[in-house]
Each structure stands twice: as structure tokens, then as C-alpha cells.
Amino acid sequence: SNEKYLRPTLYCNPRAPEVIALANELGAFEKSDREFAEAAFEFVKEKLTLEILPMDGVEATLRRGTGTCFHLISVFIALCRAAGIKARYKMFAMNMIQAWYNTMIDVDPLVKKWYDSMGYFMIEGEGEAYIDGKWMVAHVGPTAERQAAAGIPITKFGEDSLGIWYFALPGTVMHMESIPYGLGQATKLLKKIAPGSMERVNISILKQIEMGKKIIEEAGGKEAYDEMARRKGPKMPKVKLEEKKEIVFEE
């Protein structure tokens, strides 16, 4: 289809053979839109692993089994579009909970410097699928293990990351059919000037996954862990905006 939210966009081709094959396997046009979107969400969230690398197409992400949040969101969106379900990107400038910051940012001096100086320009995103007349959110970036390592609930289809581990800066939430062209530039630049920094973040992510596995096992499985985490509620960071517009996290 060439209709808005169904057609191919940058890095997100719902007509790619890999996408069509997977969409069929997940029950495209057999399940209800809601059931299919949930199946696509579960697949992308739990079967693909976060890895910081330059942006490329959904076909490459599926072959590799890894990608950044935006790679994974693009796979979710492509699967929905392949199944005839309208899907779009939701983007926002954000700051993150301390546990996420420790794993993703604090492990490398260059990444930390970059994040702290860019502050407002850290863009994060989620997918949204149009189900039964309303847009439903899908945050596919973190596996259950990474969420457990951060001490937060295991989010389900329709649950927002905002307010749980990301906090959107007011007035920055945007909805888009496509990833903007400039979005992939930061990771391309980082790979060029400091491949070691990327590697350090990726090693830290893998350690976080291992830690989360243990936490889930000790809790007695994903459901038991999730119940416990929901009872506790999210631990909000104290965010202090300083003169330079840097975001400073305080314990």
C-alpha cells in the first residue's frame, strides 16, 4: 500500500522478503490487529538484542538479530505495516532513570561527555500501531532481562516507557511516519571516531542482560518479578537543569 503509515519509509521497508516472511509466521491477516501487534511486539522486544551500531534497514536488523532502539522500533513498525496495520514513530527528547544511565552512558567517558553536553538532544522513541481506532504504544527496546536489571516492570504492548524509565522533556514529543534523515548520523559518527566507546556500551548492555536473568530467576520467573516491580513503582531520578542546559543526575 502507498497509504500514509503503511508505505515503506527510511530504514523501514514492510515489503522486504524477511519482513513479509516473519509477519506471516506471526499470523498476519489471520489474527486480529490487536493480537498481531502484540505478537510483533513480543517478538521484537524479547528476540532482538540492543546493540549500539549505525542505522541500517530492517532486513539487516532481522538478519543480525541486534540493533539500537530505532532499529528495533523500525522492525515493529515494518511488521505492522506488512500486516496492513498503520504504524508510526513517536519520538521525544528525554532523560533516563539512573540504572539506565549507569549501563548506557556512564560506562564510557566519551559517551558520557557527549550525553551530558547534548542533554536536550538525546532523542528516544517508541512505535505506535493504530488498533481499533486509536494509537497504541509499543516500546520494544529493552528485553525483560534489561528491565529487571534496572528494577522496573516488564512493559507490555500498550504501556509507555515514559514515566517508567524515560522522562520526556516537556514539549518534545513528536509523531512521525518516518525516521528523520539526521537521526542515524550520531551513531555513524561515534563508530568512526570512537569504535571502542560503542564496544564498551555494548559490553555493558550484555552484562545488564546477564544480571537481569539472575534477578528474574531469583524472583521465580518473569511474572513473579513483574508483579514485585509493579508493587514498588518506578524510582524517579532527581533532575536538575544547570546553566549549560546539561542534565545532571543526582542519586
Protein language model regions, located:
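Generic structural signal of hydrophobic/aromatic residues within well-ordered alpha-helices
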Residues: 2, 6, 19-23, 111, ...
